[in-house]
């Protein structure tokens, strides 16, 4: 789907920007082919080095391709807006507006601006995330867990772009927060165990008194799901696959449940099953659910979950694009939501998939939640 959309937008850019240039056909032709190749670079690279999910080419090459691809998308979108405006000017018979919109330098200038903005976006996508602190009120939280601190990492996407050096910085920043518990809500890695072993090794240094609990996202399935599960556990993580664990303090309990990702269906693996995950759990203990995708929040709330932590959306990547991502994820894209008595938090994520690695106005994050007790009003 991404390649088809990219190809259509590339053809549009060639038609509206490259072809009108006052250059010889011998120059416009290669330029046009270069733009089309850029739109299809995911498939081209995957044919020779790695996969669509995990391009195994040098970091600098990924960054250059990501910058060009993002610029292509931004340029195409602005061109569409300009052409709609030009059509409106024609219909309204506004010659001055038509003249302004037809200036020969306008579209190439937009292209240059798109390239510069994209370079900035890729630099932000590769930046070490900053820490965001969030207080969460949970009804009748046991007093033993008042002030309990949970650090969430999600969408780390360790890869040839976000290497072990970057992961180590994320881990160091996380450990500096001194949380009580670390949870990782999927998409830890892009690629095979052999390709990413060194890049994920720093995750073994994550530490918290109550440990590190992880679930899978969709990208673990694109790599080697069966091999990654024991690899994560060797790094000291407790991986929840439609299961739960219990945190105990002074006789009180907190249930941490985790479900798999729906993409499991493609691979004949277990689909998300919250009922199974909560089987045997104390019904009086508050439930924190780790669910990579936020779109099942309403169904999860109906089953008594107090707090759902998700990722997957990357916050929408770019301001404005978040509205499209929101529609594809049940109306949830970034930050906190009150969902039928449950709190849902959708993290922007720490990293990004190398195939679309831009962040413009949507910063990455490491999230630290402080749990607070909320007493239910009488009569509820």
Regions found by a protein language model. Give the residues of each.
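Non-catalytic terminal accessory segments
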Residues: 1-127, 376-378
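Soluble catalytic domains of enzymes that build or remodel membrane lipids, polysaccharides, and related
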Residues: 132, 137-380
């Amino acid at each position: 789907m991404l390649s088809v959309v990219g190809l259509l937008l590339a053809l549009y850019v060639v038609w509206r920007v490259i072809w009108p240039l006052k250059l010889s056909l011998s120059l416009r032709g290669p330029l046009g082919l270069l733009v089309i190749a850029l739109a299809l670079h995911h498939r081209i690279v995957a044919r020779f080095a790695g996969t669509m999910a995990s391009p195994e080419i040098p970091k600098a090459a990924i960054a250059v391709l990501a910058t060009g691809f993002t610029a292509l998308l931004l340029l195409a979108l602005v061109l569409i807006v300009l052409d709609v405006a030009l059509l409106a000017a024609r219909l309204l018979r506004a010659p001055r507006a038509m003249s302004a919109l037809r200036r020969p330098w306008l579209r190439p200038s937009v292209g240059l601006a798109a390239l510069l903005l994209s370079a900035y976006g890729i630099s932000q996508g590769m930046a070490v995330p900053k820490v965001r602190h969030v207080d969460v009120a949970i009804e009748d939280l046991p007093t033993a867990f008042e002030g309990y601190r949970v650090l969430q990492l999600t969408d780390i996407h360790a890869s040839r772009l976000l290497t072990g050096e970057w992961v180590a910085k994320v881990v160091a920043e996380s450990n500096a927060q001194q949380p009580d518990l670390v949870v990782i809500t999927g998409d830890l890695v892009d690629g095979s165990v052999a390709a990413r072993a060194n890049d994920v090794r720093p995750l073994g240094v994550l530490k918290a008194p109550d440990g590190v609990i992880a679930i899978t996202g969709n990208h673990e399935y694109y790599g080697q799901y069966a091999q990654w599960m024991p690899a994560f556990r060797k790094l000291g993580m407790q991986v929840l696959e439609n299961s739960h664990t219990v945190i105990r303090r002074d006789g009180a309990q907190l249930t941490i449940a985790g479900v798999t990702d729906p993409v499991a269906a493609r691979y004949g693996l277990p689909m998300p099953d919250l009922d199974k995950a909560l089987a045997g759990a104390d019904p009086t203990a508050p439930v924190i659910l780790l669910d990579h995708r936020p779109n099942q929040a309403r169904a999860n709330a109906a089953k008594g979950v107090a707090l759902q932590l998700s990722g997957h959306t990357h916050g929408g990547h770019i301001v404005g694009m978040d509205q499209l991502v929101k529609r594809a994820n049940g109306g949830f894209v970034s930050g906190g939501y009150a969902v039928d008595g449950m709190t849902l938090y959708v993290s922007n994520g720490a990293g990004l998939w190398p195939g679309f690695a831009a962040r413009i106005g949507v910063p990455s994050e490491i999230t630290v939640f402080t749990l607070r007790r909320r007493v239910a009003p009488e009569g509820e």
